């Protein structure tokens, strides 16, 4: 049985001071969880997360990581640094990193390796833009991205890897794949994982949906057998909507 994961990607929102208030309120209002919750804020907020969320059920992590272990790489943040801050997760391969920073599948794979070396679970993002979907090429495009981003990546177990399917055309647009659309792609992703790591491994990897998830559509998405949670953007910034997602997840 795969445990549902609700992971909030804050992107470049909130200051450390604002996050401290948000975390304190979350801590006060958090219901008992059967599912798993995580918040993924900007790097400067991670020490605040470590301080405030340490004794809660809520995990936290980063939105990116360096492909390098350490060295003269100005502006980079290593997996070892994230580990020292207590990060449980880190996103790699988000469409915004691929689009605005030119990140390739090979670079994403290196980042995933660095995280696994430090015991941090990569949330590895894949997904197609609108023009690819309209051509009917969404599945081969996404699976090619998945295979390239997992090249040489050997997680110690299925719980050490999370995949997030983010249809790029549905991020921040208010558009959303139907639950059936999401399920169809998640099935293809799981099949590709089975070919790569074996069926027993693939059956236990969590695959999140990451395209404009909100409290109105989350229950329907979770009703799909291969949707194991959400990588949530805008709906994770407001405490009430994040709590609503956690209540839906159970």
Swiss-Prot record:
A GO MF label: triose-phosphate isomerase activity
Domain of life: Bacteria
PROSITE patterns, alphabetized: TIM_1 (PS00171), TIM_2 (PS51440)
Reactions accelerated catalytically: D-glyceraldehyde 3-phosphate = dihydroxyacetone phosphate
Cell compartment(s), UniProt: Cytoplasm
E.C. number: 5.3.1.1
GO cellular component, one term: cytosol
The keyword Ribosomal protein is assigned to this record: no
Binding residue positions for substrate: 9-11, 172, 212, 233-234
Keyword Isomerase on entry: yes
UniProt xrefs under SUPFAM superfamilies: Triosephosphate isomerase (TIM) (SSF51351)
InterPro entries associated with the record: Aldolase_TIM (IPR013785), TIM_sf (IPR035990), TrioseP_Isoase_bac/euk (IPR022896), Triosephosphate_isomerase (IPR000652), Triosephosphate_isomerase_AS (IPR020861)
Coiled-coil spans in chain: none
Pathway as given in its UniProt record: Carbohydrate biosynthesis; gluconeogenesis; Carbohydrate degradation; glycolysis; D-glyceraldehyde 3-phosphate from glycerone phosphate: step 1/1
Disulfide-bond pairs as recorded: none
Gene Ontology BP annotations: gluconeogenesis; glyceraldehyde-3-phosphate biosynthetic process; glycerol catabolic process; glycolytic process
Alphabetized CDD domains for the sequence: TIM (cd00311)
Active-site residues, as the UniProt record annotates them: 94 (electrophile), 166 (proton acceptor)
The protein's role, per its UniProt record: Involved in the gluconeogenesis. Catalyzes stereospecifically the conversion of dihydroxyacetone phosphate (DHAP) to D-glyceraldehyde-3-phosphate (G3P).
Assembly and interaction partners: Homodimer.
Family listed: Belongs to the triosephosphate isomerase family.
Protein name per Swiss-Prot or TrEMBL: Triosephosphate isomerase
Native species: Thermus thermophilus (strain ATCC BAA-163 / DSM 7039 / HB27)
Recorded name of the encoding gene: tpiA
